[in-house]
Amino acid sequence: TGESYDTGDFVRILDRVGAEGDAAGFAARRASSAARGMLRGMGLGLYVESILGDPSEAAEVTFEADGTVTLAVGTQSNGQGHETVYTRFLAANTGIAPERIRILQGDSDRIPKGGGTGGSRSVTVQTNATLSTVSAMVAAFTPFVAAETGTADVRFEEGVFRAPGSNLGLSLIEAAEMARAAGRADLLRHRTEARLPGRSYPNGAHLVEVEIDPETGRTRIERYTVVDDFGTLVAPELVMGQVHGGVVQGIGQVMAEAIVHDAEGQILTGSLMDYAIPRADDVPFIRFFSEPVPSVRNPLGMKGCGEAGTVGALGAVANAVRDALATAGAGPIETPFTPERIWRALRDARAG
């Protein structure tokens, strides 16, 4: 494809997940499970993914008459917490109080071009566009502030316009109020489009241990450890939430989820009454660790994280179940690894 990985320390990721997941102690835990008549397996899943889609986005910042600020973006959150990230990012780079910032998403009247949300791209690409808009905004306001205050060598530092040797200390909100009073509507709305020079590649490792009851085929995930390299993290708590949700989705796909039809083609899993998804007691405690190697393909060093939990979970959980079955001479079997399929595989192995 002509693409190349931006950055990564894959050996460090592998070493860290083995240490945090206590891979060295697995043999003892497997023996303990066997003493109770259980089958225990360990699975490792290594992944590298790419932020996909158009690596460009637009961002528009508008200073409203009521003293608030609207950041219009081309992406659209559907539960990831983009509003929190975008607000926090704009506040950190402008000094504008977060409570004054409103996020407007996916409005094509304001942002004609937007790549939307998908492929772990939103925060990485959108914050790059926002940073570009902030830079353009500061560049436009600086000569205006200098002219209005009669001050030379105006600089924007830590959210405030300052000038050496003067007591100038003007926030962007105050500068916007001055611009409004002066009839400078051109300074009240700023929009730029920014394009990343290349894609970033999130990567990581999942280490999983499962225990199977051979009498029932029931599988429990006993240990789950994740080490990810997402580059620079803007909102670590949201990253952890996305990883947890992605892991659960991966567990569901491997262990339970399937579309079932009858002989006439009628779907039998048409609602959540029949379509199996993980419940709270199916989900283990997920230990998450970050080993960031900042990307060199965007100013903030971010790599994206949206789909990483699922991508890593699929192989790791499947490998753990197959490892456990192999101790009894069973498998491999196809997903989903339902209790019935696992029980049949073990029965067939015993029958020889």
Where are these regions (language model features)?
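Cofactor-binding beta-sheet edge motifs in enzyme active sites
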Residues: 1-12, 19, 24-352
